[in-house]
Amino acid sequence: MIEKKYIVALDQGTTSSRAIILDHDANIISISQREFTQIYPKPGWVEHDPMEIWATQSSTLVEVLAKADISSDQIAGIGITNQRETTIIWEKETGKPIYNAIVWQCRRTADACTKLKQKEGLEEYIRQNTGLVVDPYFSGTKVKWILDNVAGARERAEKGELLFGTVDTWLVWKMTQGRVHVTDFTNASRTMLFNIHNLEWDQHILDELQIPRSLLPSVHSSSEIYGQTNIGGKGGTRIPISGIAGDQQAALYGQLCVQPGMAKNTYGTGCFLLMNTGTDAVRSNHGLLTTIACGPRGEVNYALEGAVFVGGASIQWLRDELKLIADAADSEYFATKVKNSNGVYVVPAFTGLGAPYWDPYARGSIFGLTRGTNSNHIIRATLESIAYQTRDVLDAMQADAGTRLQALRVDGGAVANNFLMQFQSDILGTRVERPVVRESTALGAAFLAGLAVGYWKDLDEVKSKATIEKEFRPGIETTERNYKYNGWKKAVARAQDWEDKG
């Protein structure tokens, strides 16, 4: 029998699909990545083509094995991690999507959310049972929108002809040739349709949104065998799909934040801060979400989460729209060309503001411009906005959990930016720890998949794989920290409530 030497993580993100092969020591052996199209039909609307998601993800899986010259029978299991909340509805018979995937960033259901909030007691019911706030970010109103706006969709859904899934569900369904319709607890907890206390779909919310239960996948733990997939067609080896977690929960697990009070921030397209609260679903009084995280064996734990909609995307904006930089990495170079932002604050509320403000009507703004402002000040202020938004969330989190973080673990593309990491530590007054393996999201999916198939014995074995590459410590005084942060709060207050409401 051929030795099962490797684990594969499929990382289906907002802008690209990736496949990553890891060995027993959690070293990355090979990575394959393919970008796909971002579709913007109207201002504030964001879509993906589900078939393109599948095409890019399946081809990276074949590519990554070929690139590393590894045969599929050497793979012990596959873990899937995915952009969360993004909503796909397809025909059960043909596997054909009836509409594009509506992406988590899409704000088209803002008015539908306003209407839901007007129903007596419903907003509080949703908050209490799903841990979420009523917001276009989550899948629930996206599902309703597709059923209401695609001809014949509601009738077909009621006849049981259609299936709904977040991206993980769609990938597993495609990988198993339509045999398996599942999701995991972490992804289900982001739909605004799932009761995080009794771990079941919430019939009252389904009724309010007129969503037939037959659309929904069955819900499982994040670390178990859901089904098998063939790589390389009929002759290929059947490999267990044995781990699923939404990208932020996967990153929390990959950073081994499996004890209550441990927290991480992922700096991707958006920024996502999660703090593990163990078996206690802590309710937030500060505009944060209560969500499901992975416990030591992939079982249900809870976490507080704050989502910042625009993190690394603001650096892309500097590059693609403003043309101030040629490459994302240039932002660090130009930011350090000036000694401070010269009083400039950039509030990148391009699609509204997430936690702790939850204002879909806020818009992007630049404040504090003077005749002496140059492009380097704007670049620096844009990077600083990522750190300020992180502090907004972290302050709320510490207040809710009644604890002070000793350190923040960080991952995602923007953590390579040393200026940003140092400023993050400065503005938090907290240690920032950057791991050797930056791919925490893929690592989490790999750990969950590997534990389910016995590739790693237990979490203790896994823990020896995570080492800190660099620690950033605060380098400014409290007075300066507070002065800078107060300026940020003033800027945010002015950016809020800009767009006309419906």
Curated annotation (Swiss-Prot):
InterPro entries the UniProt entry points to: ATPase_NBD, Carb_kinase_FGGY, Carb_kinase_FGGY_CS, FGGY_C, FGGY_N, Glycerol_kin
As recorded in UniProt, its EC number(s) are: 2.7.1.30
Task: Give binding positions for glycerol.
Answer: R84, E85, Y137, D247, Q248
Question: Which domain of life does this protein belong to?
Answer: Bacteria
Keywords of the record, alphabetical order, are: Allosteric enzyme, ATP-binding, Glycerol metabolism, Kinase, Metal-binding, Nucleotide-binding, Transferase, Zinc
GO molecular function list? ATP binding; glycerol kinase activity; metal ion binding
- Which range is the signal sequence, renumbered to this chain? none
Explain what switches its activity on or off, per the activity regulation comment. Activity of this regulatory enzyme is affected by several metabolites. Allosterically and non-competitively inhibited by fructose 1,6-bisphosphate (FBP) and unphosphorylated phosphocarrier protein EIIA-Glc (III-Glc), an integral component of the bacterial phosphotransferase (PTS) system.
Q: Which reaction does it catalyse?
A: glycerol + ATP = sn-glycerol 3-phosphate + ADP + H(+)
| Annotated positions binding sn-glycerol 3-phosphate | T14, R84, E85, Y137, D247
Name the pathway.
Answer: Polyol metabolism; glycerol degradation via glycerol kinase pathway; sn-glycerol 3-phosphate from glycerol: step 1/1
- Where does this protein hold ATP? T14, T15, S16, T269, G312, Q316, G413
Q: What does the entry list as the binding residues for ADP?
A: T14, R18, T269, G312, G413, N417
Name the Gene Ontology biological process terms: glycerol catabolic process; glycerol metabolic process; glycerol-3-phosphate metabolic process
Q: Cellular component GO terms, alphabetically?
A: cytosol
Task: Report the protein's function.
Answer: Key enzyme in the regulation of glycerol uptake and metabolism. Catalyzes the phosphorylation of glycerol to yield sn-glycerol 3-phosphate.
**Subunit annotation:** Homotetramer and homodimer (in equilibrium). Heterodimer with EIIA-Glc. Binds 1 zinc ion per glycerol kinase EIIA-Glc dimer. The zinc ion is important for dimerization.
Similarity remark: Belongs to the FGGY kinase family.
Q: PANTHER family, alphabetically?
A: GLYCEROL KINASE, SUGAR KINASE
This protein is called: Glycerol kinase
Gene this protein is translated from: glpK
